[in-house]
């Protein structure tokens, strides 16, 4: 029997086809990560040293707020304010506090936005950076208050402001109170306009919902990272509402640039220099 098997001309090996999920998840993620942009595994350290951009296909990975601040603000110059805000549950929404506490533990942040001021190549600026890992960067009363305070601080101190958006929109657990933040932040921006102070809006993936419908699209200059999802409602909801097929690439930064809704698309690796040039141009 064994002799017959060994002398057989038939293949003694079986090729096992690994499914896509196994291929993507079978590599130790401490050293490697799977890139959806180029369908390949990439050394994690190479991505981190490349501003969290894939060195093969230039796909921009999501960033937590402090990592983005480290990329944009001069080392040692960032001063945070309003980091110790207290939790608010205006509607007494069930289990809302428990959910917020879990995200605090996960992200080591108090809320979905980090605010403060620092310097970009020596130029002082106020900066707000939203954290998409904290309840999808949703805007509730605390996020709205922190952004409003930052805008007012910039106006009072004659400083420019940069807001980096990354959000799923208004926070549903706060209902109408979260929607009020849209008007609150938008109204605050008028104080900058009165003093001719620049507001630079940086859109990152994703920027949607109430954030898009308020301060994110009100910048004097609106910049986006490549291939960023920007919109109010999702494409499926829109198609079901209007009973029409949306154009290819709808709600991407490239589509919005073509239609004139944003001013420029900037690679993350060049973002700090572009922001510096804009700030230097408008420096008083």
From Swiss-Prot:
A zinc finger (C4-type) spans 35-57. GO terms for molecular function: acetyl-CoA carboxylase activity; ATP binding; carboxyl- or carbamoyltransferase activity; zinc ion binding. GO terms for cellular component: acetyl-CoA carboxylase complex. PROSITE patterns: COA_CT_NTER. Pfam families: Carboxyl_trans, Zn_ribbon_ACC. Binds 1 zinc ion per subunit. InterPro entries: AcCoA_carboxyl_beta, Acetyl_CoA_COase_Trfase_b_su, ClpP/crotonase-like_dom_sf, COA_CT_N, Znf-ACC. Keywords: ATP-binding, Cytoplasm, Fatty acid biosynthesis, Fatty acid metabolism, Lipid biosynthesis, Lipid metabolism, Metal-binding, Nucleotide-binding, Transferase, Zinc, Zinc-finger. It catalyses: N(6)-carboxybiotinyl-L-lysyl-[protein] + acetyl-CoA = N(6)-biotinyl-L-lysyl-[protein] + malonyl-CoA. Its EC number is 2.1.3.15. Its main location: cytoplasm. Residues 31-284 form the CoA carboxyltransferase N-terminal domain. Its cofactor is Zn(2+). It comes from the Bacteria. GO terms for biological process: fatty acid biosynthetic process; malonyl-CoA biosynthetic process. Pathway: Lipid metabolism; malonyl-CoA biosynthesis; malonyl-CoA from acetyl-CoA: step 1/1. It is found in: Cytoplasm. Zn(2+) binds at residues 35, 38, 54, 57. Acetyl-CoA carboxylase is a heterohexamer composed of biotin carboxyl carrier protein (AccB), biotin carboxylase (AccC) and two subunits each of ACCase subunit alpha (AccA) and ACCase subunit beta (AccD). Belongs to the AccD/PCCB family. PANTHER family: ACETYL-COENZYME A CARBOXYLASE CARBOXYL TRANSFERASE SUBUNIT BETA, CHLOROPLASTIC. Component of the acetyl coenzyme A carboxylase (ACC) complex. Biotin carboxylase (BC) catalyzes the carboxylation of biotin on its carrier protein (BCCP) and then the CO(2) group is transferred by the transcarboxylase to acetyl-CoA to form malonyl-CoA. This is Acetyl-coenzyme A carboxylase carboxyl transferase subunit beta.
